[in-house]
Each structure stands twice: as C-alpha cells, then as structure tokens.
Amino acid sequence: YINFEGFSNAISTVGEYISDDALVIIETTVPPGTTEKIAYPILFEKLQKRFPNIKEVLLAHSYERVMPGPDYYNSIKNFWRVFAGCNRESSLRCKDFLKTIINTEKYKMMELKKPSASETAKIMENSFRALNIAFIDEWSNFAKLIGINLFEVIDAIRVRPTHKNIMEPGLGVGG
C-alpha cells in the first residue's frame, strides 16, 4: 500500500495557484502511473474550477540523475535526462524548459511516449544500482568469511572486456 496523501495534497496546492498555461514537471521517484493517474486528475480538477474552458493540463515527468556531494549542481546540468509529457504540448514544453538547464550539446535528452515509461525508467535505474550494490556487498561478506581479497578477485574479473564495470565493495545498499 502506498500512501499518496502528502503527494496528492502537494499537487492539489500547486493546482490551486498555477495559471492554466503553467507546466508542472514531476522530478521525483514515483510509482509508474502516478503522473497520469494521480497528479493529472487532481491538477485538471483544480484548474477547471478556475478555468472552466481548460482542455488539458501541462504535466510531465522528468527524473533527476544527480550525484550527491560537492559536484551536485554540475550533475544536474551535465547529465542525460529522460522526460515524457501527458500530452504533446506538455512534452514540447518540458523539452524546451530542460534545454535551458541541461547541456544538450554533450548530454542528449530522451523523450519517452508516456510519463509511466519515464517513471518506470527511474525505478529500474534505482533498482539496477541497488541490486549491483547488494550483489557486491554479499560477495564482500563472503570474501571476508573465507579470507580472500575481493579487490584482487575483481581485478581478475575486469580483464574480461564485458566485465570492466563491476562494482567494488563499499558501504552497502543505502550506505
């Protein structure tokens, strides 16, 4: 069960104050379908009360791929972005907005067909990273248990061209 109360309240508040031509971009990790099935209806309802002739809401999903630490801002500007709008105008406006922030000459943007695809991509990215961290963490525990140097083992594996990106042990998932 996912409690969307806080998220829904925030979207509702946004909907009470934005103009009918404002673009809303959800940049956080949310379950697939959240942008279209939760945020969109709330925004549409709030905007329709103030703008009865409104036909569609300008809403998109574009998640951040930031690296914490001293280079945080650089990781926003100089990194690839995925985005998707709830409708064509939302996608176009989102792309135009992101172009003002992202270094698109070096870091291309990827437009997906639906926000749920963008939301899924973010969760898959997070899951992929978490699984790899957990994987190497388990091997680290095993190496300690049997008394071997896991860094030496990893170096031996990395000679294979397809395995150069194997992670090294660290603090573990969430650490």
Question: Model features per residue range: what roles?
Answer:
Residues Y1-G175:
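Structural/interface elements that position substrates and couple domains in central-metabolism enzymes
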